[in-house]
Amino acid sequence: MAARVRRGPRQGRARGGPIALTATARLTIAGSSASIPRPDRACSSYLVDDGETPIVLDLGTGALANLRRYADYDRLSAVVISHMHADHFIDLIPLRYALRYGSRRRTSKLPVHLPPGGTAMLRTLVSAFASEGGEFLSDVFDLREYDPSAVLRIDGATLRFAHTAHYIPAFAVRWERDGASVTYSADTAPDERVVELARESDVFLCEATLRHGECEAGMRGHSTAVDAAEMARAAGVRRLVLTHYGEESTAMDLDESAREIFAGDIIVADDHRVLDL
């Protein structure tokens, strides 16, 4: 069965606000680039929304502007950060300003779920420029650190985590609700723990930072499209979405490389793409 995929709006929100979502769970790609944002692609960010509990997985460089086309920041249920590399969390800073000074105010603080040790790292970063100190974050965010070995429940959704093979502690995330599932690899080299987390997922968002045949010096912390396809095949997922790829890679090359390995639906991520789950 072909994946149900469509493009979101490119000209900003409708006059009355962001698009009204139905009860169908949807995955919206707000950022698909690797560490360098491009004119047409922000860094990593993904909105999973079942119409009741919109959850953002990562909020990388430039992604907030895209995200606002699909969900106002005052209605977000939570932000979950996979690891503390800037291209996965840095737009928490402009989000803080939006929550503090924007026209749409929340009635409660926004829960932000960070990996272990993430709170101290974020506060250290903020201390370099914010005179408010710790209050810069705590006045709008409810900062929490998840336990990667435990199940995180956010309203009706459940999230599970797995360690990945990356340069710093990083965690893949599996979102589930009412039989629908999305697994996000975060940044990782091929890893059996990620495969197990992704087992039989409806959608497997997997990074494809490296080009086929490209090697990293020292420890390997990223994957190729072939690696992603092999993990998708091993996990038995329905759809593979290749993401977190750089400007050197083309959609055609990524698709062709993965299609030699994985027989299911393959989508090369680009910003504003919306998938029904």
Language-model segment annotations:
Residues V56-G60, S77-M84, P115, T183-A186, ...:
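Active-site neighborhood of phospho(di)ester-bond hydrolases with catalytic His/Asp-centered motifs
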Residues L27, Y46, D58, L67, ...:
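Divalent metal-coordination and catalytic microenvironments
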Residues M1-P18:
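Compositionally biased, low-complexity flexible segments
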Residues R144-E200:
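Catalytic core of the metallo-beta-lactamase
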